[in-house]
Amino acid sequence: MKQSLAVKTFEDLFAELGDRARTRPPGSATVAALDAGVHTLGKKVLEEAGEVWLAAEHESNEALAEEISQLLYWTQVLMISRGVSLDEVYRKL
């Protein structure tokens, strides 16, 4: 897969989110999400998964890609909240 220089990878996002979790910058939506807890994060993952499904059924590929990116974001925030590493997930693929 060829990427442009402006593209953020799955690993880049995970590193960025992990950094926010460690440094806790004021006003960070990621920090607020982490502080909300696993229950809230899990509900957000379910919501985004539903939006991915609906976009796949009824919207453009661009809209679908946006919904998938949001699902990946929330899944990674949940992973960080629980202390699950990318390697742990990759071993299950």
From Swiss-Prot:
Pathway: Amino-acid biosynthesis; L-histidine biosynthesis; L-histidine from 5-phospho-alpha-D-ribose 1-diphosphate: step 2/9. It comes from the Bacteria. It is found in: Cytoplasm. One of its GO terms (cellular component) is cytoplasm. It catalyses: 1-(5-phospho-beta-D-ribosyl)-ATP + H2O = 1-(5-phospho-beta-D-ribosyl)-5'-AMP + diphosphate + H(+). Transmembrane segments: none annotated. GO terms for biological process: L-histidine biosynthetic process. Pfam families: PRA-PH (PF01503). Keywords: Amino-acid biosynthesis, ATP-binding, Cytoplasm, Histidine biosynthesis, Hydrolase, Nucleotide-binding. One of its GO terms (molecular function) is phosphoribosyl-ATP diphosphatase activity. Its EC number is 3.6.1.31. The keyword Aminoacyl-tRNA synthetase does not apply. InterPro entries: HisE, PRib-ATP_PPHydrolase-like. NCBIfam families: histidine_hisI, PRK00400.1-1. Belongs to the PRA-PH family. This is Phosphoribosyl-ATP pyrophosphatase. It comes from Mycobacterium marinum (strain ATCC BAA-535 / M). The gene is hisE.
